[in-house]
Amino acid sequence: MIAEQHQAVVDSGASKKGAKVGFVSLGCPKNLVDSERILTQLRTEGYDVTNSYDDAELVIVNTCGFIDSAVQESLDTIGEALAANGKVLVTGCLGVKKDEIIELHPNVLGVTGPHAYDEVLAQVHEHVAKPEHNPFIDLVPPQGVKLTPKHYAYLKISEGCNHRCTFCIIPSMRGDLDSRPVGDVLGEAKRLVDSGVKELLVISQDTSAYGVDVKHKTDFWDGMPVKTHMQQLCEELAKQGVWIRLHYVYPYPHVDKIIPLMAEGKILPYLDIPFQHANKRILKLMKRPGSSDRVLERIAKWREICPELVIRSTFIVGFPGETEEEFEELLNFLEEAQLDRVGCFKYSPVEGATANALPDHVSDEVMEDRLQRFMAVQAKISSDKLQVRIGQEYLILVDEVNGLGIVGRSYMDAPEVDGKVYLSDDYDAKPGDQIWVQIIHADEHDVWGVRVED
């Protein structure tokens, strides 16, 4: 999965009495969850988190290292934090390249890899003494510190990945699949819902593989046995009564069993499946599962069972050796699959990826041309599919209310990566509200609507 790059210098909302730690979180939602866990532990120990380098006694930078632009952003951010503060701890995916970080930034206080929560806290203790605080007064909310808006949250169900995609280095950074106990996942989900969360976004490196590493062993939740398996997890999450959105789903056969849950309204009819390509030879070079014919058959079957199903995917153009004919096969796949939401990236030779050694690399000029052609085809598909939504009514979750009106999302839209629903400012609403909207206009990405009575 291509990581979404974003930076957040955060303020946990803590009191202003304790020792202050600055924090910068870079990268994808999985990294954001790591940041939330570190921040929660800091707050539990009485540290304050500040959004100013100047006020902090040290700064933690949680890095991304998936693609070259992410590496550069991480290195630049470390440099900025050093220049502004002077005391910096580095963690996250880029932390596995400790020598590279120290060579460029020798003054960092310490470097750790991803999900190294205890090591990060130990390094903080080494440089900033634990503040005196009363844990019964300075309470951390049961759901922990969250960096997302209060009405939605990411629910990470596992770490690592057992795949060895040739364009990816995630397993070398985050290790093999390590599924969280299903009871722990469901407990976190309940705490989040109890705190007011209206949407849970299930994330991992490979959501479909949840529980494979522990042979789908039985755990317990609320006194009842539950298998560590994607299907059983979805069935239990559905009982929370909030939107459940699935991300990073590989098209394994058992995904077919999730579609009826969507058709029954138990979880959102939304699947994020990173197909990456359609040509059989390219998929084999990528070490990716699937073939276009089989995928198209399954998509048709899914839509027959659940007509409202929305499918998001990501693709790579310009993979080493990709011919014009193979790229055109990808375009034909787009036309046949009629996917709802699509992202596309030019192949990036990530340091350490085995695909870099493949012959016949595609020039950047050709990659850019293919990217533009790909996006033009998908823009037309997306526009046509959204035009069909005009006149229909949807429940939306309000994300923002500003001077121009209300900004929300329907079940078709995940935060940050998909489209939005815009309404005029004639309605009384606040973030986290759920309201019914009739769509009156659409382009290739977003829709506009008017409120209707519940």
From Swiss-Prot:
Cofactor binding, note field: Binds 2 [4Fe-4S] clusters. One cluster is coordinated with 3 cysteines and an exchangeable S-adenosyl-L-methionine.
Transmembrane domains' residue ranges: none
Reactions the enzyme catalyzes: L-aspartate(89)-[ribosomal protein uS12]-hydrogen + (sulfur carrier)-SH + AH2 + 2 S-adenosyl-L-methionine = 3-methylsulfanyl-L-aspartate(89)-[ribosomal protein uS12]-hydrogen + (sulfur carrier)-H + 5'-deoxyadenosine + L-methionine + A + S-adenosyl-L-homocysteine + 2 H(+)
Keywords, in A-Z order: 4Fe-4S, Cytoplasm, Iron, Iron-sulfur, Metal-binding, S-adenosyl-L-methionine, Transferase
Every Radical SAM core domain range: 147-384
Keyword field contains Cell membrane: no
Subcellular location: Cytoplasm
Cofactors named for this entry: [4Fe-4S] cluster
Residue numbers binding [4Fe-4S] cluster 1: C28, C64, C93
SMART domains xref list: Elp3
TRAM domain location: 387-453
UniProt-listed Pfam families: Radical_SAM, TRAM_2, UPF0004
GO biological process, one term: tRNA modification
Annotated ranges, domain MTTase N-terminal: 19-129
Main location: cytoplasm
Highest taxon above the source species: Bacteria
Enzyme Commission code: 2.8.4.4
InterPro entries found in the cross-reference section: Elp3/MiaA/NifB-like_rSAM (IPR006638), Methylthiotransferase (IPR005839), Methylthiotransferase_CS (IPR020612), Methylthiotransferase_N (IPR013848), Methylthiotransferase_N_sf (IPR038135), NA-bd_OB-fold (IPR012340), Ribosomal_uS12_MeSTrfase_RimO (IPR005840), rSAM (IPR007197)
Main function: Catalyzes the methylthiolation of an aspartic acid residue of ribosomal protein uS12.
Family: Belongs to the methylthiotransferase family. RimO subfamily.
Protein name: Ribosomal protein uS12 methylthiotransferase RimO
Organism encoding this protein: Colwellia psychrerythraea (strain 34H / ATCC BAA-681) (Vibrio psychroerythus)
